[in-house]
């Protein structure tokens, strides 16, 4: 074997070793690239999922806040219209106090209360419009004092001086009690009910 052949053989062997090493290095580089790529994809997928979850939570929170705000707005609007009904009823009291049934009811309450006082002094408060009706029932009874109250819309309020108790038969109080007990029904009539 001559020198050239030996050199060729040697070169071929070195070439094969270099080629093998390059192939191994290339495979290792591809493996590292694939691992890095997979790791980056996993990392960013996790970040994207976290952002999606956070955004969903924010959207749900905003949705809940808006629902509460809408309910509050509806309640305010309902209350406004219920109060409008109440105001209309108050306006109608002027018509009620002119009826015979109203005057008969005042007389009946007063007659019953005066019979039960047995000498105790009482003060009867009434609206200026009801004073003549109250005076008719009281007559000359010395135990009864009549006072007008401009704030009263109708009805009477009786103060028992001996016991310090007051019995309130004023139309405003009765109306308030009836209205409060019927608030749900009024709401159902106005806005559709259950």
Curated annotation (Swiss-Prot):
One GO process term, biological-process aspect: proton motive force-driven plasma membrane ATP synthesis
Q: Which InterPro entries match?
A: ATPase_E_C (IPR038495), ATPase_V1_Esu (IPR002842)
Q: Which GO terms describe its cellular component?
A: plasma membrane; proton-transporting two-sector ATPase complex, catalytic domain
Cellular localization per UniProt: Cell membrane
Quick one: signal sequence residues? none
Record key words, sorted:
ATP synthesis, Cell membrane, Hydrogen ion transport, Ion transport, Membrane, Transport
What membrane topology does the annotation report for this chain? Peripheral membrane protein
**Superkingdom of the source?**
Archaea
Q: Which family does it belong to?
A: Belongs to the V-ATPase E subunit family.
Record's function text: Component of the A-type ATP synthase that produces ATP from ADP in the presence of a proton gradient across the membrane.
Assembly and oligomerization: Has multiple subunits with at least A(3), B(3), C, D, E, F, H, I and proteolipid K(x).
Q: What is this protein called?
A: A-type ATP synthase subunit E
């Amino acid at each position: 074997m001559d020198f050239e052949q030996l050199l060729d053989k040697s070169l071929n062997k070195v070439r094969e070793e270099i080629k093998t090493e390059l192939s191994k290095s290339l495979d290792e580089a591809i493996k590292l690239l694939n691992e890095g790529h997979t790791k980056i994809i996993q990392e960013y997928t996790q970040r994207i999922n976290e952002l999606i979850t956070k955004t969903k939570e924010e959207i749900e929170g905003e949705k809940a806040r808006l629902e509460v705000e809408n309910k509050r707005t509806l309640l305010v609007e309902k209350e406004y219209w219920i109060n409008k009904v109440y105001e209309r009823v108050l306006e109608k009291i002027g018509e009620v106090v002119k009826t015979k049934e109203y005057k008969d009811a005042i007389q009946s309450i007063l007659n019953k209360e005066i019979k039960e006082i047995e000498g105790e002094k009482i003060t009867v408060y009434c609206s200026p419009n009801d004073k003549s009706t109250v005076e008719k029932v009281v007559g000359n009874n010395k135990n009864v004092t009549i006072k007008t109250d401009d704030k009263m819309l109708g009805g009477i309020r009786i103060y028992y001086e001996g016991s310090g108790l007051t019995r309130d038969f004023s139309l405003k109080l009765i109306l308030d009690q009836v209205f409060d007990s019927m608030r749900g029904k009024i709401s159902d009539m106005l806005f559709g009910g259950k």
